[in-house]
Amino acid sequence: MIDSISALEREQIVEALATIVRPDQIDTDEQALDEASVDRFKKYQAVHGIFDAPRPAAIVYAESTDDVARVLAFANENLVNVVPRTGRTGTEGGLETSVADTVVLDGSRMKAILTVDERNMQVTVQAGAPLQVVEDTLRKLGLTTGHSPQSKPLAQYGGLVATRSIGQFSTLYGAIEDMVVGLEAVFPDGTVTRVKNVPRRSAGPDIRHVIIGNEGALCFVTEVTVKVFRHFPDNNEFHAALVDDMATGIEILREVVVGGFRPSVARLYSPEDANQHFAHFSNGKCVVVFVAEGPASIVAATSAEIQRVFDLHPHEKVEPALIEAWFDNLNWGPDKIEAEKAAMREHHHLGYTTEISADWSSVGAIYDAVMHRVRTEFPAASDLTMLGGHSSHSYQTGTNMYFVYDYDIDCAPAEEIEKYHVPLNAIIVEEALRHGGSMVHHHGIGKYRTPWTLAEHGSAYAILAGLKQQFDPNGIMNKGTIYPVAGAGIAPRG
């Protein structure tokens, strides 16, 4: 825990907030505050009623950009730490309250779809607009955002932008940073900044990227404009094959993508991970999955190329209907989260992921190194019930790798993080960096990968540090996220 540097006591903070927003916008219920002190990084502790992060002073539900500006200006003047949030789907501790008497600033009530511009193919929404609602609205018009993370039923736009998120159709549509046209954000001193909506410009550095991916450590995203695309769901074609090893699967992904084709889905599952999804047909092999999407002529050409590449490698064809049925049930909504909570209570068992990225030459070596180190060095390896991985987002220059690990928990709930999650996370991050990859692909640094932030950025860290000094000199924005700070997450290294 980090002590508050504010001269105000928590009661004084709450009293002052009540002069800035209406009383019904302030929540001080103890259970709500405890739940607001963590995110899904500590899901096992939370489900057992253990909240070891400092309890926030209050949750403030902003209803306008002006609310956000006034709350931040107050916090900045009085040195009160603020944790921004919207959909609460974070998984890396970015929503954890590391500082005593933090104010959690919630944008979920700012949920309007402001404009749908079919001529210029863009939609403008407030930070709390649920992605599922936006997508459903667009689908009625024959359009799509193309953004479909597994958190889609729960995620909201402010968090999607702030964490630099990505969706399951990224190989075709891109990640959130490829979709954002313009946005509005509020900085700690209450300054409202708008980046205008233009298709492209050459007017200095692209300042959208000061805001995109800032994880609430620099500013609060209040409004977003993203591209939209025409949607042709009836044209989708599904392809899959079984292959003998990850190296073959990686090469198949690479050949399709670098050949100039953009299937919306391009995935590779290790045998262990495949068994979680495809046990009815995977037979202990790796599974390669593609979805061709778009206008009929593009789908036909993409499908032909996928089949051509498959035929260059030993493989067993998988029936398309099996993949279509699987893909229709990938997203995580409230029902799956409640089922996971029930399982954690009853079985003391847990599953997590850590995702990295690397070039085509390195990703296989990273995968092999992680598998070897976890199996030979991780002290609790005997508690693992599954260790595997999958690639789900590919590029001209490389791909990502999700490491997936499930384990039985043989300790008190309060000890789970340190015994299991932190050391497994560390091995994956270390191997990604050792091989020249990135320690995080799309979940954000949060508060538990900060020990490696300097190693991730190297000499470019000075630029990142300069942004913090310029925009948050008082250090009130989500302390301990992105930027390593003693007392937040785990101890800084090096």
What residue ranges belong to the model's regions?
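N-terminal flexible segment immediately upstream of the FAD-binding catalytic core
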Residues: 1-73, 91-121, 271-280, 325-351, ...
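C-terminal substrate-recognition/cap domain of FAD-linked oxidoreductases
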Residues: 27-43, 250-427, 435
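Conserved, mostly hydrophobic/aromatic
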Residues: 75, 216, 472
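FAD-binding subdomain of flavoenzyme oxidoreductases
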Residues: 111-267, 491-494
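Activity-critical C-terminal alpha-helical subdomain
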Residues: 445-494
